[in-house]
Amino acid sequence: MQLDNQNLIWIDLEMTGLDPENERIIEIATIVTDKDLNILAEGPVLAVHQSDELLAKMSDWCIKTHSANGLVDRVKASKLTERAAELQTIDFLKKWVPKGASPICGNSVAQDKRFLFKYMPELADYFHYRHLDVSTLKELARRWKPELLNGFEKKNTHLALDDIRESIAELAYYRDHFIKLDGDQK
């Protein structure tokens, strides 16, 4: 384990919906990579307890998806609060990345950050203010090189750790096929 300013913190949240004013976090996971996207460590994968009433108010899509992947059962069985999950995550990150060094990394991370600001503000503050959002490259590829979109396929399990692994792999794909760091810009 080595604390390094260049390490990247990857995060994904699963929520009961998309509106942080009315919805809550039900799962959080993190992975730390080096600057070259090699996985150094996987953080705790934490199901956050939420009330049956809140879970029952989820959209049909959320109920179907989070029931099929087992997350609803894990949330109901969990005793973990959002605050406890936040502190466990920060304790893990402190071993790998200094506070304020890493941008928040993942897919559509602005959405995750909205929930972090609302429910896990200390964790939100752990990140640099910049974002490393893989979905930006996806949107650019869609417009400038749409043929690249067929080269990477996601499983979309909507489990936080799986989603992070896919985000890292997707960024590596775009690095190799879109950004082309080797200087071969055809």
Swiss-Prot record:
Q: Which Pfam families match?
A: RNase_T
Per UniProt, residues of the Exonuclease domain are: 8-171
Any keyword Nuclease? yes
Gene Ontology biological-process entries: DNA metabolic process
Q: Which GO terms describe its molecular function?
A: 3'-5'-RNA exonuclease activity; nucleic acid binding
Asked if Cytoplasm is a keyword of the record, the answer is yes
Recorded protein name is Oligoribonuclease
Classification of source organism: Bacteria, Pseudomonadati, Pseudomonadota, Gammaproteobacteria, Pasteurellales
Gene it is expressed from = orn
